[in-house]
C-alpha cells in the first residue's frame, strides 16, 4: 500500500520532493532540466539578490524581489551580464548618495541669501500693527491690510505713533504708553516721595562721604603714646 501511494505521488509530482513543488516552479521561474539544476540556479539568484537588496528590506521582500525580477530567457538565467549591471536599474535600490561638497555649497548659498534678506529689511523684527480702522480699508476675503508704525517707511501715510491714543495701541508697545499725571501724583503721595526734602535718610547715599569727613574733622584729636 505504501509503495502504491509513493508511486502515485511520484507520478503526480515528477519534479518535486515529498509531493511538494519546488518554490522556483511555483513562482514561475521556468522549466529546468533537473531538480538539481534549478536548485543550484535558485540558490545563486537568491545569493545575488540578498547581496544587492538595501538594508531596510525584510527577508520576504528580498525573496519576492529575487523571484519576480530575475532575468530569465527561455528558462535559463542570463549569466552573461554582471550582477552589478543586472541590478543597477532595480526599483528597490535606494537613491544615490549625493556629494557632501554640493550640500555644503547649497547650505552656504542659502545662508548668504538669508543674510541679504535680513540686511535689506530696515527693521528685522516685527514692526507691523493691524489696521486700526477697518471701515476705511475694507477687507478683501483673506487679504488683510497692515500699516507700519514708522510713517517714513509706510505707503498709506498712517498717523504718527505720538498722535495715536494709548488705548488703541497694542499691549507690547511700552515706549509709547501714556501715563496720566493724576495717577503719577497719587503714586508719589502714596510712596511719600513728595516729602523727600523732609527725609534726610533718603539722601544719605549722596552725602555719605561729606558726612564722614565732617564727622572726623569735628572729633577731638587723640594722641596715643
Curated annotation (Swiss-Prot):
Q: Which InterPro entries does the UniProt entry name for this protein?
A: CITED
Which molecular function term from Gene Ontology is one that the record holds?
transcription coactivator activity
Bilayer-crossing regions: none
Would I find Repressor among this entry's keywords? yes
Q: Name one GO biological process term.
A: left/right pattern formation
**Where does the record place it?**
Nucleus
* GO CC, one annotated term: nucleus
- Where mainly found? nucleus
* Entry keyword Transcription regulation: yes
Q: Tell me which family the UniProt entry assigns to this protein.
A: Belongs to the CITED family.
Instruction: Give the protein's function.
Output: Transcriptional coactivator or corepressor of the p300/CBP-mediated transcription complex. May be involved in sex determination, early gonad development, left-right patterning during embryogenesis and differentiation of the adrenal cortex.
User: Could you tell me what this protein is called?
Assistant: Cbp/p300-interacting transactivator 2
- The species this protein was found in: Xenopus laevis (African clawed frog)
Amino acid at each position: 500500500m505504501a509503495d502504491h501511494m509513493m508511486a502515485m505521488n511520484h507520478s503526480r509530482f515528477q519534479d518535486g520532493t515529498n509531493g511538494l513543488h519546488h518554490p522556483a516552479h511555483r513562482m514561475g521561474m521556468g522549466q529546468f532540466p533537473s531538480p538539481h539544476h534549478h536548485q543550484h540556479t535558485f540558490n545563486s539568484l537568491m545569493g545575488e539578490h540578498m547581496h544587492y537588496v538595501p538594508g531596510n528590506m525584510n527577508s520576504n521582500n528580498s525573496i519576492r524581489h529575487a523571484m519576480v525580477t530575475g532575468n530569465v530567457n527561455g528558462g535559463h538565467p542570463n549569466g552573461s551580464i554582471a550582477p552589478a549591471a543586472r541590478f543597477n536599474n532595480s526599483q528597490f535600490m535606494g537613491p544615490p548618495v549625493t556629494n557632501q561638497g554640493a550640500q555644503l555649497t547649497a547650505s552656504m548659498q542659502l545662508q548668504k541669501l538669508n543674510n541679504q534678506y535680513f540686511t535689506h529689511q530696515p527693521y528685522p523684527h516685527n514692526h507691523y500693527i493691524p489696521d486700526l480702522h477697518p471701515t476705511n480699508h475694507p477687507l478683501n476675503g483673506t487679504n488683510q491690510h497692515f500699516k507700519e508704525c514708522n510713517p517714513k517707511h509706510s505707503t498709506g501715510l498712517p498717523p504718527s505713533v505720538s498722535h495715536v491714543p494709548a488705548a488703541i495701541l497694542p499691549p507690547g508697545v511700552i515706549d509709547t504708553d501714556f501715563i496720566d499725571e493724576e495717577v503719577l501724583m497719587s503714586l508719589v503721595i502714596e510712596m511719600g516721595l513728595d516729602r523727600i526734602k523732609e527725609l534726610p535718610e533718603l539722601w544719605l547715599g549722596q552725602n555719605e562721604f561729606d558726612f564722614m569727613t565732617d564727622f572726623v574733622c569735628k572729633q577731638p584729636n587723640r594722641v596715643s603714646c
